[in-house]
Amino acid sequence: MTVNVYDLANELERGIRALPEYQALVQAKAKIDEDEEAKKLWTEFTEFQMKIQGLIQTGQAPTPEVQTEMQSFNQKIEANPLLKEYATAQQALGVYVNDIERIIFSPLQDIAK
């Protein structure tokens, strides 16, 4: 019996969208989009995250100034109920994503042993 992995992947995608954690994340994002202050801060934060990822990808360590800026962003996000709700929802969905990633990559890890 041949398994169509694309069908399985599409079924997984639908399953993720049906999760209560995914729905909570969608609702939290909609609330951010309706609030200009939260939306602006979230946009600034995601741009800052991309900047840090760029540094890391080029082998550069974040400077103390960048680390201070990250702490400042984290404090602002924790202080904003909409952003805090979104971050919490992201973490909840992230548990599923991490588990799924572990399962999917298990066969490749078996080969690498």
UniProtKB/Swiss-Prot annotation:
Family: Belongs to the UPF0342 family.
Origin superkingdom: Bacteria
Record protein name field: UPF0342 protein SMU_782
Coiled-coil parts of chain: none
